[in-house]
Structures are given as structure tokens and as C-alpha cells.
Regions:
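Glycine-rich, Arg-bearing micro-motifs that act as flexible, cationic patches
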Residues: 107-132, 147-150
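Structural beta-alpha unit
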Residues: 1, 24, 74-108, 145-158
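General small-molecule cofactor/ligand-binding pocket signal
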Residues: 34-36, 84-88, 139
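Short, well-ordered secondary-structure micro-motifs
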Residues: 18, 45-48, 97-98, 121-122, ...
Length: 158
């Protein structure tokens, strides 16, 4: 059913859970995995300001951390699953939507930020954005709720 699964990874617990589900799906379906992570780049004008070298150092550190996240995720994929990694230097929302449109993906798997319904509606999220703008099916994997989130959900339910 699925041939090429795109997985959004960012090092969060929710993304890690999404990766586990994507690996299981890819293994069962004999599908390829594409692991995508994005690191936003500061606007070009920021480099023309005082302190630009410190900003450049932070930008490089963010890139290295993102590449480490991708390597760690790739190492978790069994050899029986074909995997490709992509690191995009841009914000997560456009990076994911571009990869979806440019790649031959038939499923996107990503973690939820685990926000309550009201917070998600007010703040938005990458998963919400991709869910509503993707041309392919999107599987949102919810993370485990902590005690605060459970209390919030119970309060919202009345």
C-alpha cells in the first residue's frame, strides 16, 4: 500500500514515537523511509548587523544539532528498511510541504506537539499545518500525555 514514507523528525519525544510507527509501517509494507528535519536559517539581514558572527555560530550549532538528530534517527532504522535522510535549511512548515510535493511520498508520519485543543487552535502547529495542506495522507502520532496534559484534558472534557 505504501511505497515511500516521509517522517518528520526534530528530536522530540513525539517525533521519536512517530519514527517508531513509521519504521513498523515501512517494515510491514516493504516501503522506503525518508527522514526529514529542518533547521530555520536567520533572515539574511541579520548577518549584516553587529553580533553577526555570534549569530553565525548559533546557526552552525543548530545545523550540527539537527544533523545529529537525523543521524541518531537513521541509526534506529533496521537494515531491512531502505532509508534516506534530508536536512532542509528553512522553517519546518515550508520544508515539509516542499518535500511532500517534490518527493514521491504516499504517506507523511509526524508527531503531534501534544497541545490541548484550545492551545492548538490559537497557536497552530507544524503538524496541524501539514495535515491541512498536504496532498498525501498524514499520520499524526500523539505522544504520551504527562500529568499536566491529562489534567488539562480532564478539565476540558468537563
Amino acid at each position: 500500500m505504501f511505497r515511500n514514507i516521509l517522517v518528520a523528525i526534530d528530536g522530540s519525544r513525539d517525533a521519536d514515537r512517530a519514527l517508531v510507527h513509521a519504521i513498523d509501517l515501512a517494515d510491514c509494507e516493504h516501503a522506503k523511509l525518508t527522514l526529514l528535519s529542518a533547521v530555520p536559517s536567520p533572515p539574511a539581514f541579520a548577518y549584516a548587523t553587529p553580533g553577526a558572527s555570534a549569530l553565525s555560530d548559533l546557526d552552525e550549532k543548530a545545523r550540527q544539532e539537527t544533523e545529529a538528530i537525523v543521524r541518531t534517527a537513521r541509526d534506529r532504522v533496521p537494515q531491512s528498511v531502505s532509508v534516506t535522510t534530508v536536512v532542509k535549511i528553512e522553517a519546518a512548515k515550508p520544508a515539509l510541504l516542499k518535500q511532500i510535493s517534490e518527493g514521491d511520498h504516499d504517506l507523511v508520519v509526524m508527531g503531534s506537539r501534544g497541545r490541548g485543543a484550545v492551545r492548538s487552535a490559537l497557536l497552530g502547529s507544524v503538524s496541524h499545518h501539514v495535515l491541512h495542506h498536504s496532498d498525501v495522507p498524514v499520520l499524526i502520532v500523539r505522544g504520551e500525555r504527562d500529568e499536566g496534559q491529562q489534567a488539562e484534558a480532564a478539565h476540558a472534557a468537563g
